[in-house]
Amino acid sequence: MQPLWLCWALWVLPLASPGAALTGEQLLGSLLRQLQLKEVPTLDRADMEELVIPTHVRAQYVALLQRSHGDRSRGKRFSQSFREVAGRFLALEASTHLLVFGMEQRLPPNSELVQAVLRLFQEPVPKAALHRHGRLSPRSARARVTVEWLRVRDDGSNRTSLIDSRLVSVHESGWKAFDVTEAVNFWQQLSRPRQPLLLQVSVQREHLGPLASGAHKLVRFASQGAPAGLGEPQLELHTLDLGDYGAQGDCDPEAPMTEGTRCCRQEMYIDLQGMKWAENWVLEPPGFLAYECVGTCRQPPEALAFKWPFLGPRQCIASETDSLPMIVSIKEGGRTRPQVVSLPNMRVQKCSCASDGALVPRRLQP
């Protein structure tokens, strides 16, 4: 079985390290990049005294402030626990099948999905069938199996998203595993009542040519109705109870921070008026609450580290952030004018326990 971890990505915020406190240098660097400047502009105090922020500029700034509280950047958290869901195989055509999984109440409340694994049982190819296809080279005796998530929209139209794809040999048999974590993440974003999880499995030839033209048709997967349920498609859901392994929310301001403090969000005020580089340049805001993630995270059992060898230790990170709208002064053609900019991922909204290597979920498109 090929490892499933190759498609997992490391999620990194523009902070020095996950959950680390935002510094003035990082804020300055983000602002320079947003304005495509190499250095802080030189502005005279006399120019600033005559500068008036127009109503439409301030309205744009306020609108960005309001929007930033609803449009957040999200990260992925780690988890553990195991559930198995049996699915139905509905044949669409010779090489394409639709898997249907009833998912309601399959994911425990207050839990985080770590990984979803689709297991399909590849049936042995009869020797007579292999003989009819003649002598197949190792390359021509392979087929590509692709798994897509199928979404049925309210208007009845369908949309598919590629989830996983791999090559299988027609000479092999047994269980094949596919990482379908992203499909379950998409399903979780659907509005209620949620439809079943629909996975479309396609078997296609890898190469063109007479030897490979029909080899992919030899790849068959066991369907519902197999003797005693053996070999029917399975969906494994690995989750972690956030009550034991998650963060606690905001830190208790009355409690002292210790090495054993559970991961939490701590207030941290960034005073822009006290930063020399912001003088005469940053008009709004005078400062802001950035927050930082502090504390430690409970580590999963050692057995889990064996299953996911490429995941590092769990740590307290910023899993949801907001942008920071600002009004800055820009000098063009001898005139100074105000301009609204928005710096992404500047304010921590939520802290979570996560592990390096966890999947970054994509947003579900309309």
From Swiss-Prot:
One of its GO terms (molecular function) is cytokine activity. It comes from the Eukaryota. Disulfide bonds join C251-C264, C263-C316, C293-C351, C297-C353. Residues 22-76 form a propeptide. Glycans are attached at N158. The keyword Glycoprotein applies. It is found in: Secreted. Its main location: secreted. The processing of the protein may also occur at the second R-X-X-R site located at AA 132-135. Processing appears to be regulated in a cell-type specific manner. Pfam families: TGF_beta, TGFb_propeptide. One of its GO terms (biological process) is determination of left/right symmetry. Keywords: Cytokine, Developmental protein, Disulfide bond, Glycoprotein, Growth factor, Secreted, Signal. PROSITE patterns: TGF_BETA_1 (PS00250), TGF_BETA_2 (PS51362). One of its GO terms (cellular component) is extracellular space. Required for left-right axis determination as a regulator of LEFTY2 and NODAL. Belongs to the TGF-beta family. This is Left-right determination factor 1. It comes from Homo sapiens. The lineage of its organism: Eukaryota, Metazoa, Chordata, Craniata, Vertebrata.
